[in-house]
Amino acid sequence: MATFKDACYHYRKISKLNSSILKLGANDEWRPAPITKFKGWCLDCCQYTNLTYCRGCALYHVCQWCSQYNRCFLDEEPHLLRMRTFKNTISKEDIENLLNMYDTLFPIHEKIVNKFINNVKQRKCRNEYLLEWYNHLLLPFTLQALTIQLENNTYYIFGYYDCMEQENQTPFNFVNLVSNYDKLLLDDKNFNRMAYLPPILQQEYALRYFSKSRFLDKPNRGLKRNDFSDNLMEDRHSPTSLMQVIRNCVAKHLDDSEWNKACTQVTNAKNYMEVMNSAYTEHYSVSQRCKLYTKNKLNTLSRLTKPNYILSNHETCALNVHNCKWCQITSCYKIWEDFRIKKIYNNVLDFIRALSKSNGMAGHCSSQERIYRYIPKLFLIYDEEQWTESVNSLFKCLEPVEISEVEYVLFDHEINWEVRGLILQCMNGSIPRILNLSDVRLILSSLIYDWFDIRYMRDTPMITSTTNELRKLNKKNELIDEYDLELSDIE
């Protein structure tokens, strides 16, 4: 059994404040919940189990039982998970406030210990101090935390997490923040708690404390596209669909600059109960536009590219080619439902085909040419070094002619109207008959940046913003984009 979950269950009964704060879905009756996908630690109850997605941030960090309360570590409402969540720089004072909150919610003194022992020893068979019966008294105060970096913020979710040696399939990683505090002072606090326990429980308490307070930080694997669930999409079949986010809020909005002081609210039980009584939910429709999602789409596009088209004689655009095994794309992939991807694919291949034909490259659909190997990488514009190298190699394959120490290639083949319009925009209103390497780079980048200008995108989706940030962006009408109207980034 998870120690933190057990402690919340038993300590709920000692006061009205605890009854309100320590209510976990994992300790309540199970309700229908979404299917699980990853193995990891539930941030709400701290147990290692199968995780499902959070309705507040789309990350997999909540178990099937706790999902019924829809709590997210990015919420505004000061529930237990939010009060255990700290952001960016953590001072010694912040940690002291956290430990004071723990001491308020999970006290150990003679009266509490005797009460729990008397509750357990109700039958003759329970005269021994079995660890299973006193698991809730074996919760040490540690500075063990799961951390994650979202955009420009680093979040630390403190708690007591069992089974640290288990496989972690989530983007959260363990860190030990004891160096931000006084190690000897933390030892002293735990030794004082241990003093009230029977000797056999003291031994187990000490073992748990030292194992969770002396470990080395675990490596951070970073965020991946699959770490975010698609279940928050309004329409899972639409690549431009908005994401529906639910956040728990309170009437008195707290400023993000005071983020790390949320745990101090438990010191005044009356005020805390008043704040919690004003709790409500806010719903936001948020764009999925960000570098993480865009990179995933461009990677898929690169993998599905059919470079043979650039030397073909098909009289239609690349995506409309049928009955040609060398040029016809596999249309079953969801990515082709995104009109932006279609436009980028058609326009880039149309431009490269015009360059190839202009410079006398002979070939056909089934021919094997060296230039083909560089075409898929032209879509990976987020990797500047690889993309530049691919453009340079492609330019060399066109056998440029040197004029006044500058190499040029011909450009006199027909192109479609969209490519023509984009070239007019980036080449000062004219379409040159010869292009140098710099011109080719500019045109190729413009064809992609027209729809995915990755230079100005967030790293992670906006659903990872704090509730205050979402509220501010919503007032400015900046949570959604204009892609549904087929307006590009440039427009």
UniProtKB/Swiss-Prot annotation:
Region spans: Interaction with host IRF3: 320-491
Chief localisation class: host cell
GO biological process, one term: symbiont-mediated suppression of host cytoplasmic pattern recognition receptor signaling pathway via inhibition of IRF3 activity
Regions crossing the membrane: none
Stretch list, region Important for cytoskeleton localization: 82-176
Annotated stretches, region: Zinc-binding domain: 42-79
Record flagged with keyword RNA-binding: yes
Residue ranges the record marks as coiled coil: none
Subcellular location: Host cytoplasm, Host cytoskeleton
Gene Ontology MF term list: metal ion binding; RNA binding
Assigned keywords, A-Z: Host cytoplasm, Host cytoskeleton, Host-virus interaction, Inhibition of host innate immune response by virus, Inhibition of host IRF3 by virus, Inhibition of host IRF7 by virus, Inhibition of host RLR pathway by virus, Interferon antiviral system evasion, Metal-binding, RNA-binding, Viral immunoevasion
Motif placement: pLxIS motif: 485-488
Keyword Metal-binding assigned: yes
Organism domain of life: Viruses
Annotated signal sequence range: none
Entry GO CC: host cell cytoplasm; host cytoskeleton
Annotated spans, RNA-binding: 1-81
Subunit organization: Interacts (via C-terminus) with host IRF3; this interaction leads to IRF3 degradation. Interacts with host IRF7; this interaction leads to IRF7 degradation. Interacts with host CUL1 and CUL3.
HAMAP family linked: ROTA_NSP1
Function of the molecule: Plays a role in the inhibition of host innate immunity by inducing the degradation of key host factors required to activate interferon production such as IRF3, IRF5 or IRF7. Associates with components of cullin RING ligases (CRLs) including CUL1 or CUL3, which are essential multisubunit ubiquitination complexes, to modulate their activities.
Domain notes per entry: The integrity of the zinc-binding domain in NSP1 is important for degradation of host IRF3. The pLxIS motif targets host IRF3 for degradation; however phosphorylation of NSP1 pLxIS motif is not required for its activity.
Family: Belongs to the rotavirus NSP1 family.
Protein name listed in UniProt: Non-structural protein 1
Upper taxonomic lineage: Viruses, Riboviria, Orthornavirae, Duplornaviricota, Resentoviricetes
